[in-house]
Amino acid sequence: MRKSYSPSDIESVVQKHWYKNKTFAVIEDSNKEKYYCLSMIPYPSGNLHMGHVRNYTIGDVISRYQRMLGKNVLQPIGWDAFGLPAEHAAIKNNTDPSIWTYSNINYMKSQLQSLGFAYDWNRELITCHPDYYRWEQWFFTVLYKKGLVYKKTASVNWCSYHKTVLANEQVTNNCCWRCHTPVKYKRIPQWFIRITNYADQLLHGLDQLTHWPEQVKIMQRNWIGRSKGVNVTFRIENSNDTLTIYMTRLDIFMGITYLVISTDHPIALQVAKTDLNVAHFIQKNDDFYTKLNKKNVFYFEKMGMPTHIYAIHPITNSKLPIWVANFVIPMECDGMGAAISIPAHNQQDWEFAYKYNLPIKPVIKNLDAIEPNIAMQAQETTCDGILFNSGEFDGLSSCTASNAIVKSLIARGVAQYKVNYRLKDWGISRQRYWGVPIPMVTLSNGVVKPVLLDRLPVILPKNMSTIHRSNDGYVDNSLKMYPNWIQTTYKGQAAIRDTDTFDTFMESSWYYARYTCPRYNDAMLNVHAANYWLPVDQYIGGIEHAIMHLLYFRFYHKLMRDEGLVYSDEPAIRLLCQGMVLADSFYYVSPNGQHIWVDPTHVTIKRDRIGGIVKAIDKDGRDLIYDGMCKMSKSKNNGIDPNIIIEKYGADAVRFFIMFAAPIEAPLEWKESGIEGAQRFLKRIWNLIYHHIQDGPVDALSVVILNHAQKFIRYNVHKTIEKVTDDIDRRQSFNTALSAIMKLVKKLYNAPKTSMQDRAVLQEALLVIVRLLYPFTPHISFILWKALGGSEDIDNATWPIVDTQAIQNDRTLVLVQINGKMRHKVFAPLNSDKNVVYKLLETEGVLNKYLIGKKINNIIYVPNRVINIIAK
């Protein structure tokens, strides 16, 4: 063992050992309890960032810990390799996206290996490889045959920059989640998967997920948005047509004075054929949707156009004018594109009615029985009140009236109960090149067929062709630009391929299952292997995926279950959502007013006495503005390159800091001083063990002859095992686990080391510490374990077990003072009197040097805590 700790010397050696011996490769073993630990699959963007490092370090700590418990641990890794960034890079560099993607994978793989993660690299997946997406295409054809897939022309979210459709979940503040371009609404043919068929299962399944963060479950419940209501059918005057509208609140039904429909509602489109005003209104307000969403609807002018068509109120038989309105969005109106209007009790409806001189009819008094004043605004929403102006329902409470009105409507044959969902079917068509081709063809007679199994996979055309730019400068590189590829055959008949590709969330919705059998060629999954490993025991990823990936992840699992591929109802038992990694951010303002963000590593900082930043300058001497701790990002240029930090401090120090600096679900503030502190601690461990070994061989530990000080050390060692085990396993409080280990190391530095049993106790303690540290800092632990004489490699060592005898509470630690100064500590039986404690001190002979030539005048004793001997 070398005298000095040098991570660059040991880490590569240990990593080569793991790679050569395939230490972490696993197979199914029915004789061992399995444990499947998985961090969310990374996108090969070109470089790991510290968010990646935090995510994968957490997974590795848990995996190594579970392995030490004797479990058969699967921890795989792969690459979610399709997507727009690769396509954009290819366009920019005039190359094929596969070249960019595989180059990035090779580099990022080397980064992961340099951090020492215990992956089974034999199971590495790359989702853009045909061997992977072949089965995704096959499964799509299975769902199509089951009726769970359909194609329709629909109003969709359209990103004009990327020239592709976005799912509802991919729209943030009415902008594309990637490029932040305002989203437009467009009607185009799209493939959908019926996720709404599984809405109740997805909702009720959340109750099984007792080890998922409550915040994630709340977000999914809200996104699914189950509501109970009534579908009410309104007859159209002088027509056999009807208009059906979903309602959740019926006590205000008698206050309906007009109806509104969206600009693409069939009634609106029909009227537009003969009414130029309506036609012009529809055309004019198409762009309105680019500005509108649920959050800002109140800040835009509400506009409408009468259709001169009337619906009939089912109870009063009064005529209700139907208006085309710019604030009715089909996907926001439960897919019906129509809504009732009760202007007396809804501010948006009131504003519209006031503007166009439509009737306003109040029908609910508050519980004080005062009629609402609606001259200036609608009545504030009330959950309860008394009906008036409502005919036969006058005088009823809101609750009673709701039930009575529903019964009346049902009796008239114009209403039925309906459970509705905010969740909409998953639109999976994307109009880009770099994705999985949708395996459908259209015959010359217009019949659509799924591609046959023996013709799968449908592979992308080789090499992206000439870049196509539209008049507005946006790139259109969808598969429709590849005419030779589009032409194909189906059972000898001429056919054309579908030119859309799958939403990339498809690939990331089932990768976890394919990890269980990545080289299996006979089916999508090897059912035996999949159901040995599944469900995932521990899944790790950011909470930002709550209503996208994590919802599709659960949905896809249920689809595979219903195909008999997996047996469990949910894909993952436990979910951990780690916090973001934050770093200092600095900028200056350029002459043209732009914020120019400066790499923190190029900044010189002056701090005040409490550590606050009071001045910052860049390498050119320019004064900078400090923007605080922000999420590491390219946009603020405050990311930290893991390679530089690993080279400087070592992978173990990085891993230690990542796990120690903050509770795992909280944001982590990146500070290089914290990495320095982690490395100092590892050096202390190394030095402690080095000097212990230099002192020569160690006798066997004999617990029956230990003195009080030695027992005290063992007590601390085994209490630390107990705490660290609970912190890692149950609480997942990794920072407090490391804190406990650090406290124990400090105690060992001060422990007696003179006698052979002193050294035997220390040997036991050091072997424990190295094993406790192994999940966090595996490289240094590997070397120190061997140096201490540990049997085999530490990779095969077991987690330390608490010696319950060592931590029994029949003894207590009493502090010993001479004239008020701390001189010693002694273990004494609980509740001993001062004579017993003093006798123990006499037996140990530790007081003699302090009492020579002195007379004891008094002994002050606080039971179980302190004894103070007063001597002169």
Swiss-Prot record:
Chief place where the protein resides: cytoplasm
Q: Name one Pfam family in it.
A: Anticodon_1
Any one of the GO BP annotations: leucyl-tRNA aminoacylation
**Domain of life (superkingdom):** Bacteria
Gene Ontology terms for molecular function: aminoacyl-tRNA deacylase activity; ATP binding; leucine-tRNA ligase activity
Q: Where is this motif: 'KMSKS' region?
A: 631-635
What EC number is given for this enzyme? 6.1.1.4
Q: Which SUPFAM superfamilies match?
A: Anticodon-binding domain of a subclass of class I aminoacyl-tRNA synthetases, Nucleotidylyl transferase, ValRS/IleRS/LeuRS editing domain
Q: What does the entry list as the binding residues for ATP?
A: 634
Position of sequence motif 'HIGH' region: 42-52
Q: Where in the cell is it found?
A: Cytoplasm
The record's keywords, sorted A to Z, are: Aminoacyl-tRNA synthetase, ATP-binding, Cytoplasm, Ligase, Nucleotide-binding, Protein biosynthesis
What is one cellular component GO term in this UniProt entry? cytosol
Q: Which NCBIfam families match?
A: leuS_bact
Q: What protein family is recorded?
A: Belongs to the class-I aminoacyl-tRNA synthetase family.
Q: State what protein this is by name.
A: Leucine--tRNA ligase
Question: In which organism is this protein found?
Answer: Blochmanniella pennsylvanica (strain BPEN)
Point out the gene that encodes the protein. leuS
